[in-house]
C-alpha cells in the first residue's frame, strides 16, 4: 500500500474495475428484495453542473447503502434529450440538434463515470431515439382511440422569440421562462390529453404518498384545485343565448350586482360589433399575459357590453361587462360579481361606479362597513329576502336547492386543472402521430407506419421547424389515400413522464413495457430531484402511471413511494459595473477576497484590478457566472472528496453553500482515513479479536465503534440525514486516531473498527473504500460486502454517570458500575471531596436515589 492518498490513481482504476465486472448491472431476481433508486434524468446540455452532482450523489449513496443491505438494487440513468436548447445551440454552432445532443451525451456520460456513480449502464436510454419515442407515439394513438386525446383551437401563451407555445407555468411575470421575451396570446389548434379525467384520482391518491414532502403535495392539491359550487344560468335581454357562471359562494348570490365575461366570449364579440371602445379593449386583451400569478396582480380593466342579464331570484337587471380578469379557458368564460364580498369584484366595482350590495353581516352581527374593502369572511345573511338569518352552510344549500328547483342552477365540482396541451411548434421533439386525410378526416397514424421518425439530418434557420419548412416530409398515404402528417411535436414532458418505467425493460421490442419486469421493479422506491418540478413533471409522471395502469401495463397506482427534493447549490456571486453601467459578473474562482476575523468577505477584486461588489450566496447560475465546474474540482481533489463534501455540508433537502475550504476539509479527512489504514496495515497480520479478553478502555472504544454503526445505520436508512452520519464517522475516526495500537487486542480491535469505518464510508466515497477494503483484507469486493451490523452486547454500558446532590444542589458527578447498589453509590459519593465537605458534622435526614441517574442527600 502506498503511503500517500492519490485519488487520481485509484479512482480511474476502480472505475475500470466496475466497468469490466459490470458490477451494477442487475436483472429481476424474485429471491431478493428489490430496491429501485432513481434520480431525475439530466438534459444533455453539454456539461454537468453542481446541481446534477448533488442530485446524483444523494441517489448513489442511497443505492450503494441499499445494495450493502443485500437488496437487488436498480439505479439507471438516461438522457432527457429532446428540447428547445438544442435548437438554439444548433443554430449558434452551425450544426443540427441531433449531433449536438449526441456529442453532449458522450461528454456528460464520461463526467458521470468520473464521479463514480454506480449506474446500470446497460439500461441507458436517450429519449430522442426512435427506439424510445415509438412507444410513446403508439400509446398516444391508443389514448386517442380511448377518447382521452382531442384537438381543439385554443388561446395559448405564444413566445414570439422561441416560436412556441408555453404552458401557464412557463410564463413568469408575463415573459417566457426561457428567454424573457414578452409573451403574446394566440389562437392555434392543439392536441390535448384529458388529465382532467383523472383529476379526482390524482387528488385523492396524494393521501397515499406518505413519503412525499408535504410542500409538493400541497402544491399539487392547489394546482388541481378541486372546488364544490353551483353553476347558475342567467337570461340576457336582447341576446340569443343564456350566460352560465360557476360560483363556490352561492350564499352571496343575492349580492350579485354585475356579471363579467372574457374578452373572447361570444357575447363580448357580438357587443363589439357596434362598440369601438369594446372592440379596442378586446384587441388589447388578446395580447394580455395569462398566467394566473399575473392575473392576481395586474390592473383590472373592463368595458360595459351594454347587455343586461336578469338575476334569477330577484328579477333585477344587472349589467354585463367584459373584463380582463376573466379567461375563456377557465370555466365558462363568465363570472358573477359580488363586490360586497369579493375583493377583486369590489375593486372593479369601485373603479367603474357599479352597485355594491352587502348581504353578509360582520362577525359582531352589525352591517359591514364597505367603505374601504369587501367583507370576504363567511357569516350570517341579511338583505337577502327569504334567506335572511341563515349561516354560510345553510345559505349555500338553501340557495343551491332553490336555483336547482327553478331549473337555473346545478351543483357542480370544478377543477383549476386544465387538460394537458401536448403540441409544440418546434422541430426537436417526437412527431405527434396523427394524420389528416384528403377529405379532412383526422386519424391516428396506422401502427405499420410507426414510429413516425424525426429526420435528424436537417438545416436549422432558427425560425421555422425543418419538418414544417419541408412540404414533402408531411406527405404520406393511409389506406391508399393521400394524407398529411401532423408537423407539431410533443411537449418534452411526454418523454419524461414514463422513462422510469422503460428503464425496467429498455430492450423490450413487443410494446411499451414488459409488464413482468415493470411490476417487479415498480413502483420506484425513492425518486430524487428538485422541487421546481412539483406541479409539472411530477404531476404528469403520476398521471402517466395511471394511464399505463389502466392500459394493463403496471399494477400499482403511483409511480414512486418516496420523493426526496434536494436543496439548491449556492455559491458566492460578484460583479463590477462596466463603462455603460452594466453588471459584469465575475466567477468566484477569479475573485481575490479579503475576509474579516469571522471569515466574512469584506473586500474583493479580480485579476484585472476591478473592485468587485459581493452580493452574497446565490443559486449557481450562468446568469451570475457563479457556477463551479465539477470536473475542475474532481481533477483537483478527486471524486470522493467532492462527493463527501456534497453530503456533509448540509442536509440533503436544504440549500448547500459551496465553500472550497469545506472541500479541502473533506479532502483532509480522507487523507487521515488513508493514513490510519496505512499505519495499521504496515504492522502486518492481525490476531482474532477476543471480546472476553478486552480491557475496560478497549471495551469503551469498541462500544464507540458499535454505537457509531447503529447511529450511521439509522441516519442513512431511516432518517436520511447523511450529514450527521458522516459527522458520527468523523468523531469515531478522531477516537481511533488516539487509540493505542501496541497490544495484540488493540490491533485486533483497530482492524474491526477500520473495516466498519470503510464500509460505512463506502456509499459516500466508494473509490477510496474499495481500495482500503482490499488493504484491510476484507472478503471479496466491498461492492458485495454486507453493511456492518451493530453488536448489541458491545453497546451495553459497564458504568454509568450518577449526579450527586446535597439538598438539591449538584455537588459532584460520579462514575459507578451499572449494577452498583444504592449503598455502593452512597459510599462512592462520600469519597468525593466536594460531597464530604457538605456532609461534615450534619445528619443525613433523607436519601432520594434514582438508580443509575441521581443521588440526592437531604441534610439538616
From Swiss-Prot:
Motif annotated as 'HIGH' region, chain positions: 73-83
UniProt motif ('KMSKS' region) ranges: 650-654
Domain of life the protein comes from: Bacteria
One GO molecular-function entry: aminoacyl-tRNA deacylase activity
Keywords from the UniProt entry: Aminoacyl-tRNA synthetase, ATP-binding, Cytoplasm, Ligase, Nucleotide-binding, Protein biosynthesis
InterPro entries noted in UniProt: aa-tRNA-synth_I_CS, aa-tRNA-synth_Ia, Leu-tRNA-ligase, Leu_tRNA-synth_edit, M/V/L/I-tRNA-synth_anticd-bd, Methionyl/Leucyl_tRNA_Synth, Rossmann-like_a/b/a_fold, tRNAsynth_Ia_anticodon-bd
Enzyme Commission number(s) of this protein: 6.1.1.4
First-tier enzyme category under EC: ligase
Catalyzed reactions: tRNA(Leu) + L-leucine + ATP = L-leucyl-tRNA(Leu) + AMP + diphosphate
Assigned GO CC terms: cytosol
Keyword Ligase included in the entry's annotation: yes
One annotated GO biological process: leucyl-tRNA aminoacylation
Localisation: Cytoplasm
Positions contributing to ATP binding: 653
Classification via PANTHER family: LEUCINE--TRNA LIGASE, MITOCHONDRIAL, LEUCYL-TRNA SYNTHETASE
UniProt cross-references to NCBIfam families, sorted A to Z: leuS_bact
Similarity comment: Belongs to the class-I aminoacyl-tRNA synthetase family.
Name under which the protein is recorded: Leucine--tRNA ligase
Gene: leuS
Amino acid at each position: 500500500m502506498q503511503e500517500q492518498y492519490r485519488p487520481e490513481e485509484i479512482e480511474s482504476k476502480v472505475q475500470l474495475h466496475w466497468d469490466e465486472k459490470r458490477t451494477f448491472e442487475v436483472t429481476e431476481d424474485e429471491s431478493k428484495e428489490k430496491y429501485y433508486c432513481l434520480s431525475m434524468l439530466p438534459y444533455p446540455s453539454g456539461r454537468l453542473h453542481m446541481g446534477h452532482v448533488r442530485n446524483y450523489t444523494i441517489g448513489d449513496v442511497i443505492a450503494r447503502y441499499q445494495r450493502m443491505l443485500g437488496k437487488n438494487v436498480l439505479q439507471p440513468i438516461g438522457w432527457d434529450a429532446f428540447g428547445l436548447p438544442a435548437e438554439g445551440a444548433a443554430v449558434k454552432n452551425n450544426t443540427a440538434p441531433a449531433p449536438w445532443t449526441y456529442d453532449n451525451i458522450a461528454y456528460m456520460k464520461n463526467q458521470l463515470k468520473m464521479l463514480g456513480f454506480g449506474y446500470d449502464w446497460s439500461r441507458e436510454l436517450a429519449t430522442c431515439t426512435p427506439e424510445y419515442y415509438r412507444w410513446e407515439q403508439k400509446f398516444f394513438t391508443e389514448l386517442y382511440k380511448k377518447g382521452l386525446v382531442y384537438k381543439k383551437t385554443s388561446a395559448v401563451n405564444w413566445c414570439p422569440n422561441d416560436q412556441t407555445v408555453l404552458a401557464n407555468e412557463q410564463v413568469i411575470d408575463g415573459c417566457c421562462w426561457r428567454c424573457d421575451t414578452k409573451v403574446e396570446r394566440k389562437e392555434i389548434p392543439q392536441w390535448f390529453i384529458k388529465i382532467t379525467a383523472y383529476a379526482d384520482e390524482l387528488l385523492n391518491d396524494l393521501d397515499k404518498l406518505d413519503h412525499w414532502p408535504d410542500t409538493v403535495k400541497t402544491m399539487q392539491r392547489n394546482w388541481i384545485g378541486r372546488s364544490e359550487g353551483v353553476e347558475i344560468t342567467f337570461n340576457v335581454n336582447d341576446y340569443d343565448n343564456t350566460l352560465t357562471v360557476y360560483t363556490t359562494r352561492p350564499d352571496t348570490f343575492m349580492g350579485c350586482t354585475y356579471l363579467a365575461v372574457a374578452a373572447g366570449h361570444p357575447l363580448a364579440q357580438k357587443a363589439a360589433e357596434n362598440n369601438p371602445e369594446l372592440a379596442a379593449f378586446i384587441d388589447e386583451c388578446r395580447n394580455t399575459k395569462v398566467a394566473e400569478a399575473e392575473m392576481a396582480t395586474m390592473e383590472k380593466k373592463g368595458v360595459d357590453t351594454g347587455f343586461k342579464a336578469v338575476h334569477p331570484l330577484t328579477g333585477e337587471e344587472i349589467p354585463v361587462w367584459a373584463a380582463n380578469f376573466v379567461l375563456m379557458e377557465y370555466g365558462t368564460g363568465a363570472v358573477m360579481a359580488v363586490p360586497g364580498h369579493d375583493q377583486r369584484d369590489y375593486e372593479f366595482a369601485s373603479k367603474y361606479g357599479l352597485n355594491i350590495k352587502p348581504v353578509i353581516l360582520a362577525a359582531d352581527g352589525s352591517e359591514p362597513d364597505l367603505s374601504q374593502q369587501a367583507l370576504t369572511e363567511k357569516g350570517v345573511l341579511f338583505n337577502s329576502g327569504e334567506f335572511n338569518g341563515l349561516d354560510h352552510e345553510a345559505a349555500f344549500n338553501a340557495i343551491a336547492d332553490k336555483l336547482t328547483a327553478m331549473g337555473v342552477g346545478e351543483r357542480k365540482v370544478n377543477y383549476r386543472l386544465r387538460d394537458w396541451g401536448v403540441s409544440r411548434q418546434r422541430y426537436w421533439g417526437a412527431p405527434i402521430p396523427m394524420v389528416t386525410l384528403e377529405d379532412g378526416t383526422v386519424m391516428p397514424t396506422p401502427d405499420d407506419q410507426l414510429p413516425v421518425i424525426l429526420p435528424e439530418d436537417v438545416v436549422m434557420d432558427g425560425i421555422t421547424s425543418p419538418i414544417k419548412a419541408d412540404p414533402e416530409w408531411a406527405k404520406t398515404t393511409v389506406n391508399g389515400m393521400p394524407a398529411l402528417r401532423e408537423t407539431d411535436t410533443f411537449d418534452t414532458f411526454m418523454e419524461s413522464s414514463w422513462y422510469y418505467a422503460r428503464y425496467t425493460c429498455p430492450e423490450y421490442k413487443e410494446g411499451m413495457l414488459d409488464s413482468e419486469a415493470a411490476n417487479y421493479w415498480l413502483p420506484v422506491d425513492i425518486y430524487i430531484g428538485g422541487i421546481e418540478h412539483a406541479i409539472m413533471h411530477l404531476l404528469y409522471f403520476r398521471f402517466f402511471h395511471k394511464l399505463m395502469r389502466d392500459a394493463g401495463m403496471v399494477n400499482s397506482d403511483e409511480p414512486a413511494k418516496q420523493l426526496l427534493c434536494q436543496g439548491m447549490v449556492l455559491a458566492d456571486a460578484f460583479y463590477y459595473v462596466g463603462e455603460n453601467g452594466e453588471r459584469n459578473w465575475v466567477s468566484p474562482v477569479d475573485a481575490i477576497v479579503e475576509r474579516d476575523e469571522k471569515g466574512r468577505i469584506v473586500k474583493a477584486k479580480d485579476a484585472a484590478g476591478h473592485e468587485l461588489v459581493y452580493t452574497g450566496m446565490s443559486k449557481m447560475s450562468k446568469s451570475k457566472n457563479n457556477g463551479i465546474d465539477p470536473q475542475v474540482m474532481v481533477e483537483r481533489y478527486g471524486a470522493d472528496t467532492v462527493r463527501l463534501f456534497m453530503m456533509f455540508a448540509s442536509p440533503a433537502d436544504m440549500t448547500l453553500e459551496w465553500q472550497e475550504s469545506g472541500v479541502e476539509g473533506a479532502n483532509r479527512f480522507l487523507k487521515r482515513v488513508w493514513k490510519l489504514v496505512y499505519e495499521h496495515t504496515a504492522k502486518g497480520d492481525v490476531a482474532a479479536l477476543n471480546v472476553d479478553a478486552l480491557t475496560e478502555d478497549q471495551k469503551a472504544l469498541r462500544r464507540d465503534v458499535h454505537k457509531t454503526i447503529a447511529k450511521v445505520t439509522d441516519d442513512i436508512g431511516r432518517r436520511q440525514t447523511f450529514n450527521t452520519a458522516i459527522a458520527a464517522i468523523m468523531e469515531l475516526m478522531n477516537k481511533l486516531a488516539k487509540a493505542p495500537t501496541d497490544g495484540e487486542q488493540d490491533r485486533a480491535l483497530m482492524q474491526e473498527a477500520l473495516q466498519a469505518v470503510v464500509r460505512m464510508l463506502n456509499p459516500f466515497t466508494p473509490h477510496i473504500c474499495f481500495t482500503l477494503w482490499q488493504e484491510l483484507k476484507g472478503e471479496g469486493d466491498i461492492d458485495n460486502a454486507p453493511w456492518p451490523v451493530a453488536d448489541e452486547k458491545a453497546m451495553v454500558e459497564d458504568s454509568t454517570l450518577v449526579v450527586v446532590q446535597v439538598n438539591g444542589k449538584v455537588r459532584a458527578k460520579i462514575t459507578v458500575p451499572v449494577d452498583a447498589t444504592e449503598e455502593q453509590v452512597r459510599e462512592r459519593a462520600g469519597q468525593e471531596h466536594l460531597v464530604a465537605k457538605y456532609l461534615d458534622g450534619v445528619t443525613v435526614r433523607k436519601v432520594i436515589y434514582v438508580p443509575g441517574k441521581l443521588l440526592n442527600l437531604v441534610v439538616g
